[in-house]
Regions:
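Terminal, low-structured helical/coil segments at or just beyond the last alpha-helical repeat
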Residues: 334-353
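N-terminal leader/linker segments that initiate helical-solenoid repeat arrays
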Residues: 17-42, 46-47
Length: 353
């Protein structure tokens, strides 16, 4: 390469870098954001504070987030509250959302639902979906007698594509909750939107409705399977558990114990109690997996600990067969309290009365 060409390349790079430097945001906020992304929270906080003092509301909000989460500093909810309040007063919707959250949970201040409502409402007007949803939660679960307000704000959150808001409305219309008139048609519409927005619970609900022909829908296995598969892919334990049951029983699909086991394992790991118990059964029978009573006991125990009465019943039976009467009584008692009649009967026999 000739010296002349090299000189041209070097000059070109110099001017390119100069151009990029001119394009780089070197405002207080820009410097703060780059520092924050790189994990230099101390520098980020310093520049967010400068931005905030300059009247840039986003800088105030980001300071609130840093103090609320203890990023590069100790958690300080009072300072977070102060910065969120400043941001919210400047119509920063994220600042209002953060402020509402602290009042809602009573962090850095006394819990105050009215203050939370005021902050969330301002953010909701500024089109912050989660704030609208949180207003729905407050009116639904925390301040009783406001079902109409809850529906209004769940609807607003759904309109802003907040999947969970759509799902909650689906449940309300399917079950007739929140004082709405029960409507299968509306329930399905809301579930469909929530599922399109990747809400696993909504996809699972649709799968169950199509599988059983409920809510005025025709039974359609193929559609049900697709929705359950999507639910499972979105880490919904119920969707995975339902697929496991289909393959275990050969319902609508070719019976495949190995696939059933895999889905049950996936569901169990996500917290499905009944799926853990079903894995216990498969280990006890050597179905799709080598027979292993230790693993059977462990999985029945997982299911029982998570509240599956069948898992408790099976676990107690294993302890009884192992001549461990004390544990058998304790677990039958738990199964009985969970509502399993046979566990109550066995408990009575073991206690001798």
């Amino acid at each position: 390469m000739s010296f002349k060409i090299l000189k041209i390349l070097v000059c070109g790079l110099f001017f390119l870098n100069a151009h990029l430097w001119e394009k780089q945001d070197n405002s207080f906020l820009g410097v703060a954001e780059r520092a924050y992304k790189s994990g230099n929270y101390s520098k980020a906080a310093s520049y967010f504070k400068k931005a905030c003092n300059d009247g840039v509301s986003e800088g105030c909000t980001q300071l609130g987030i840093i103090y609320e989460n203890g990023q590069g500093t100790r958690i300080d909810y009072k300072k977070a509250l102060e910065y969120y309040k400043t941001a919210c007063q400047a119509d920063d919707r994220e600042g209002c959302f953060g402020l509402g959250g602290l009042y809602d949970e009573g962090l850095g201040t006394a819990q105050n639902y009215q203050e939370a409502i005021d902050a969330y409402a301002k953010a909701c007007v500024l089109k912050h979906p989660k704030s609208c949803y949180n207003l729905g939660i407050i009116y639904d679960r925390k301040i009783k007698g406001n079902a109409d307000q809850a529906v209004t704000y769940y609807q607003k959150s759904c309109n802003f594509d907040m999947a969970k808001g759509c799902y909650v409305l689906g449940v309300a219309y399917e079950k007739g909750f929140l004082e709405v008139k029960q409507s299968n048609h509306k329930a399905v519409i809301y579930y469909l939107k929530a599922c399109r927005l990747d809400d696993g619970q909504a996809c699972r609900a649709l799968g169950s409705l199509f599988e059983n022909g409920d809510a005025g829908l025709d039974e359609d296995f193929e559609v049900a399977f697709d929705y359950l598969q999507k639910a499972c892919g979105l880490n919904n334990s119920g969707g995975c558990a339902s697929l496991g049951s289909m393959y275990m029983l050969g319902r609508y699909v070719k019976k495949d114990p190995q696939k059933a086991f895999n889905f049950f394992k996936q569901a169990c790991d996500m917290g499905s109690a009944v799926s853990c118990s079903r894995m216990g059964f498969m280990y006890s029978q050597g179905d799709a997996v080598p027979k292993d009573l230790r693993k059977a006991l462990d999985n029945y125990e997982r299911g029982c600990d998570m509240g599956d009465e069948v898992g408790c019943f099976a676990l107690a039976g294993m302890y009884y067969n192992m001549k461990d009467k004390e544990n058998a009584i304790m677990i039958y008692d738990k199964g009985c309290k969970l509502g399993m009649k046979q566990a109550c009967e066995n408990l009575t026999k073991l206690r001798g009365y």
